[in-house]
Amino acid sequence: MALNGPQKTVVQLVSVVVVMGGLAWASVPFYDWFCRVTGFGGATGVAEAGSDTILDKTIKVRFDASKERGMPWEFRPVQTEMELRIGETGLAFYEAYNPTDRPVAGQASYNVAPYSAGGYFDKIACFCFEEQVLQPGERVQMPVTFFVDPEIVNDRDAKYVHTITLSYTFYEIDLPEGYAALDAGEKTNTN
């Protein structure tokens, strides 16, 4: 069946809209994958264990914390910076406090600056890998274990980096189902 002019135009326009919608839907997971693979945008790597190679060259790591507007927690790095040898495993802590009278769940997102160092900053363990739930008045110290990959000294851009900033932003999220039921139960009066 041959399409006449207006029908052909409609089919082409619908096809363009469908393709654009598909590309928009796929762009978020693709961009996430791209950033993790290349370190673009300050995305960091994840490692199972520390580096086998430790260089004599040192690098300073600064720690930064922020929170989304409306997130009721207090959130800060326990120490603001540390200096370690490239390849050496570092351990830093961030502190979170829930000053409210209700449980609050949060999820941390992170990045590394400068962006050229993102692909060489490897986390072994991090509180950002899972959701956090703080009870009313609860204060916790959350660890992050990391190292700077010795391959950074071979990168034409990143080898000149002397300071890396690890930054976390906490966002409030919905309470997990079990916590929501507990919170609702605490608010009901029973005799």
Curated annotation (Swiss-Prot):
Keywords (A to Z) from UniProt = Cell inner membrane, Cell membrane, Copper, Membrane, Signal-anchor, Transmembrane, Transmembrane helix
- Pfam families in the record: CtaG_Cox11 (PF04442)
Give the Cytoplasmic membrane side ranges: 1-9
Periplasmic domain ranges by topology: 31-191
Q: Name one GO cellular component term.
A: plasma membrane
Tell me the superkingdom of the source: Bacteria
GO MF terms listed in the record are: copper ion binding
Transmembrane residue ranges: 10-30
Q: Which InterPro entries match?
A: CtaG/Cox11_dom_sf, Cyt_c_oxidase_assmbl_CtaG
Q: Which SUPFAM superfamilies match?
A: Ctag/Cox11 (SSF110111)
Protein purpose: Exerts its effect at some terminal stage of cytochrome c oxidase synthesis, probably by being involved in the insertion of the copper B into subunit I.
Q: Which HAMAP family match?
A: CtaG
- Which family is this sequence assigned to? Belongs to the COX11/CtaG family.
Under which name does UniProt file this protein? Cytochrome c oxidase assembly protein CtaG
- The protein's organism comes out as Ruegeria pomeroyi (strain ATCC 700808 / DSM 15171 / DSS-3) (Silicibacter pomeroyi)
Taxonomic lineage of the native organism: Bacteria, Pseudomonadati, Pseudomonadota, Alphaproteobacteria, Rhodobacterales
